[in-house]
Amino acid sequence: MNTVKTVRELRAAVARARGEGKRIGFVPTMGNLHSGHAALVTKAAQRADFVVASIFVNPLQFGANEDLDKYPRTLAADQERLVQAGCNLLFAPTVEEMYPDGMSVQTRVSVPQLSEGLCGASRPGHFEGVATVVNKLFNMVQPDLAVFGEKDYQQLAVIRAMVRDLNMPIQIIGEPTVRAEDGLALSSRNGYLTPEQRTAAPALYRTLQHIAAGIGRGQRDFAALVAEGQAQLSAAGFRPDYLEVRHAVSLRPAVINDRDLVVIAAAYLGNTRLIDNLYLHLEEKTA
């Protein structure tokens, strides 16, 4: 695996691979990689001939009071993990390389509606930052396909919409969430948890499972199920940001006739914000 730091080097390396007739796969990350990221790269390697990963902690998607400065930078360990997962090329640019004229004058990409509510409500500007940097990376790499984790469900929906609306010839692949044995979704932010918080953290996924099980049994009072779930989270030491049942594609609030749903949540344990979701498909009842 080669590592490049400039757009010029990136484009030259991708052009060589494409000139050899290779299908290009892409996995954008912010580094501090774990097994969940490795699964994305492995999926890309299964679907493409040449896999590009990027590591860039994007300031544009962090709010004023968020953890940009303390976000871990672990390049050497990340490079080793990428090699093991089957990555061919790592793009690790500086902020200056990505935003040469500064972020204040950077053209922004905004995906309306899908970016609003849920994480967008408590993190204003976050998805604009995500859409902008992913758009830039797509233009730099020009991949045939890109792989994103389903743990960041709203982000995946935003990116799918951006690619569709802007007619980008890129296949977007969602990879199922990788979990620890106790059910906690793998996340770079799990490292911020104290041992006690880490023990409590799986309650987030158990709450989603509880709500999904109720829906599966035929309960359609989503508000009542969510209220139960919020009580469970609070009892486990969480401070819920949101917990909702949404339509799995449009992310609008679910209605009783919906067949594809996602139970989606964000909650704080101490100062650490964790997110998770659980998709469920309901079969239509036959007479």
UniProtKB/Swiss-Prot annotation:
Gene Ontology MF terms in the entry: ATP binding; pantoate-beta-alanine ligase activity
Catalytic activity, reaction form: (R)-pantoate + beta-alanine + ATP = (R)-pantothenate + AMP + diphosphate + H(+)
Active site: H37
Residues engaged in binding ATP: 30-37, 149-152, 178, 186-189
Localisation: Cytoplasm
Sites where the protein binds (R)-pantoate: Q61, Q155
Any Pfam family the entry gives: Pantoate_ligase
Domain of life: Bacteria
Additional detail: The reaction proceeds by a bi uni uni bi ping pong mechanism.
Full protein name: Pantothenate synthetase
Gene name of this polypeptide: panC
